[in-house]
């Protein structure tokens, strides 16, 4: 579960950094900076917790698929510029955060056996849901 949490957050940090260099809209850049900041914080919180618990996150099919999906999305986004990039980036963020919230609700939180990990995932879920709503609002403004 920890490997999935770190991978999911790293994907959004990397995509956000790309958006900071390519986005045209000030609102999209602001959103991208929020993604980099918030998801970097989530990675640190997860890393601190696994250190405290003396566990090593194990890569698995889900974490590997998240990383691959993130790489594929960034490759597609990197080919776009301006308004086309902004729209594609925000569309990607809506889909990505929707998937993350569902994974947290359906798999990660219910299967977390450690109370501290479950608490961290619940906190991350709240942030991911807020990001999803923010991305949806941006999506509406870009149409």
For every predicted segment, state its role.
Residues 1-143:
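His/Met- and acidic-residue-enriched segments that coordinate or traffic transition-metal cofactors
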């Amino acid at each position: 579960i920890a490997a999935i949490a770190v991978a999911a957050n790293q994907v959004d940090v990397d995509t956000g950094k790309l958006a900071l260099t390519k986005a045209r809209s000030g609102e999209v850049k602001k959103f991208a900076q929020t993604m980099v900041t918030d998801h970097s914080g989530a990675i640190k919180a997860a890393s601190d917790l696994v250190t405290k618990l003396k566990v090593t996150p194990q890569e698995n099919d889900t974490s590997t698929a998240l990383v691959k999906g993130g790489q594929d999305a960034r490759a597609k986004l990197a080919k776009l510029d301006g308004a086309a990039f902004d729209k594609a980036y925000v569309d990607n963020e809506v889909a990505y955060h929707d998937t993350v919230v569902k994974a947290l609700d359906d798999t990660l939180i219910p299967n977390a056996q450690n109370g501290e990990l479950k608490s961290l995932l619940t906190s991350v879920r709240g942030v991911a849901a807020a990001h999803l709503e923010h991305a949806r609002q941006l999506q509406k403004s870009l149409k």
